[in-house]
């Protein structure tokens, strides 16, 4: 008689199972939060230093040379000489309106990406890193062309914040990316990306007034303002018109592009409500598969998440048996990627993964490994022993799990041990960012 193995505990056991190997420890989470706080505090301080210089210029007309000298005594000194001159020049040349806007500017912060979605996995291979994306948000008047406060000044001040911390911490490195500044800490297998956004000041202030009125009821945290070391935050109060959230670009003619990360966050939260809490787990497992198959590269996390949501929205599955659910996902992923994976954010100009007629070597490599995944899972399911089953399934997810006792003989169960998750039509993402 042919044996069939059940892998639910292999996937879900919080100690020895795959889930237990992927979830960050409390220490790792706290280290990321501490790093985030250090950067936020330094960013706030650098902006206060720059505003102090601008205030001195307003009070008594200072020469360019004096402004340069003042810049060199702040954390901005960690920029290059030419960048310091540029900061001094931009402050010196501000007109009265721009200076007043700058003096009233206080950066806000909002974490985005896998840390926020609770799908961040521990690194597996050398070179892979834990990452946290923490946006710096600048409440500014809505602009049609260029804002009063120059794009270059804002970028340079955020860079100065990061570079000053790099100068103070051995082993930290700064990297300039097109859409963010990055601090990389190789010894801790960690990096933090700091993108910068402009958001509409008037709308933000109205929301903040509402937040202040309800401060006693606020528990969660999305936007966080370190004013007197306080944290203010509320996912609904800080909903903003996505059309007016603009991401700063470092290079090129386009200085800003419309991009609101909360669209994707809301989409994923809504998907978890609609499909079930197991969605976060299977998305973690697919990212674990990716990290085991490629030391760098492979399909993006968001493309795996979007394809997985599409599958679980349309195929009935048993949330109480994630081994079977993963087989369903693996079976349908190749066709999802072959037709192309669209972004849940309608403002994205490109698909997350192109359709098959546009595939090059990279895409063909990804398709080949996607097509191999269901074969691996099927082979593991029909292995001759637990140890052989473990060896085979680890071909997909790496040798993270070593306890073969988590793999048990499949019992003769009805088609579904509980009512299957209903397959509903995927919901259209609202551009107005309704929180899930």
UniProtKB/Swiss-Prot annotation:
Disruption phenotype: Cells lacking this gene show a significant defects in intestinal colonization. Its EC number is 2.7.7.-. Changing residue 108 to W: Abolishes enzyme activity. Changing residue 137 to R: Abolishes enzyme activity. Pfam families: DncV-like_NTFase, DncV_C. There is a cross-link at residue 436 (Glycyl lysine isopeptide (Gly-Lys) (interchain with K-? in acceptor proteins)). Primed for activation by Cap2 which conjugates it to cellular proteins; priming is target protein-specific (green fluorescent protein does not activate the enzyme), but which protein(s) activate is unclear. Enzymatic activity of DncV is inhibited by folate-like molecules, such as 5-methyltetrahydrofolate di-glutamate and 5-methyltetrahydrofolate, suggesting the existence of a signaling pathway that links folate-like metabolism cofactors to the regulation of cyclic dinucleotide second messenger synthesis. Lacks a regulatory loop and is constitutively activated. Residues 419-436 have a biased composition (Polar residues). Induction: Expression is repressed by the transcriptional regulator VspR. Part of a CBASS operon consisting of capV-dncV-cap2-cap3. One of its GO terms (biological process) is negative regulation of chemotaxis. The keyword Cell membrane does not apply. Residues 339-358, 417-436 are annotated as: Disordered. Changing residue 434 to E: DncV-GFP fusion cleaved by Cap3. Changing residue 260 to A: Impairs protein folding. It catalyses: GTP + ATP = 3',3'-cGAMP + 2 diphosphate. ATP binds at residues 182, 259. Mg(2+) binds at residues 131, 133, 193. Belongs to the CD-NTase family. A01 subfamily. NCBIfam families: cGAS. Overproduction of the cGAMP synthase DncV leads to an increase in intracellular cGAMP, and induces the formation of cells more translucent than normal with a defect in cell membrane integrity, planktonic growth arrest and a small colony phenotype in El Tor V.cholerae. This is Cyclic GMP-AMP synthase. It comes from Vibrio cholerae serotype O1 (strain ATCC 39315 / El Tor Inaba N16961). The lineage of its organism: Bacteria, Pseudomonadati, Pseudomonadota, Gammaproteobacteria, Vibrionales.
């Amino acid at each position: 008689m042919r044996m069939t193995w059940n892998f639910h505990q292999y996937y879900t056991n919080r100690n020895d199972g795959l889930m237990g190997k992927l979830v960050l420890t409390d220490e790792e989470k706290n280290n990321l939060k501490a790093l985030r706080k250090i950067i936020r505090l330094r960013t706030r301080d650098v902006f206060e230093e720059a505003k102090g210089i601008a205030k001195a210029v307003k009070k008594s007309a200072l020469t360019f040379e004096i402004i340069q000298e003042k810049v060199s005594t702040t954390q901005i000194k960690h920029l290059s000489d030419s960048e310091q001159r540029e900061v001094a020049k931009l402050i010196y040349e501000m007109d009265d309106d721009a200076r007043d806007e700058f003096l009233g500017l206080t950066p806000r912060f909002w974490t985005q990406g896998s840390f926020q979605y609770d799908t961040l996995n521990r690194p597996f291979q050398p070179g892979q890193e834990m990452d946290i994306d923490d946006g710096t948000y600048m409440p500014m008047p809505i602009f049609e062309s260029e804002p009063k406060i120059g794009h270059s000044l804002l970028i340079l001040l955020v860079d100065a914040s990061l570079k000053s911390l790099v100068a103070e911490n051995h082993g930290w490195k700064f990297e300039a990316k097109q859409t963010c500044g990055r601090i990389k800490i190789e010894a801790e297998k960690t990096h933090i990306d700091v993108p910068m956004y402009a958001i509409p000041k008037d709308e933000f202030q109205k929301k903040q007034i509402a937040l202040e009125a309800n401060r006693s009821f606020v528990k969660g945290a999305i936007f966080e303002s370190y004013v007197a070391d306080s944290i203010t935050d509320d996912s609904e109060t800080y909903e903003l018109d996505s059309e007016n959230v603009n991401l700063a670009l470092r290079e090129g003619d386009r200085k800003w592009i419309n991009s609101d990360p909360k669209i994707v966050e809301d989409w994923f939260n809504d998907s978890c409500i609609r499909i079930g809490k197991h969605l976060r787990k299977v998305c973690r497992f697919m990212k674990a598969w990716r990290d085991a198959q490629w030391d760098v590269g492979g399909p993006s996390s968001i493309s795996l998440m979007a394809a997985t949501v599409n599958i679980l929205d349309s195929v009935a599955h048993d949330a109480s048996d994630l081994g079977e659910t993963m087989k369903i996902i693996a079976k349908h992923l190749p066709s999802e990627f072959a037709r192309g994976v669209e972004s849940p954010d309608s403002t994205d100009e490109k698909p997350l993964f192109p359709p098959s007629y546009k595939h090059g070597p990279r895409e063909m490599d990804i398709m080949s490994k996607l097509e191999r995944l269901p074969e691996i899972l099927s082979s593991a399911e029909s292995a001759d022993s637990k140890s052989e089953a473990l060896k085979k399934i680890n071909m997909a997810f790496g040798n993270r799990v070593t306890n073969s006792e988590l793999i048990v003989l499949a019992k003769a169960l009805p088609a579904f041990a509980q009512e299957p998750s209903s397959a509903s039509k995927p919901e259209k993402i609202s551009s107005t960012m309704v929180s899930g």
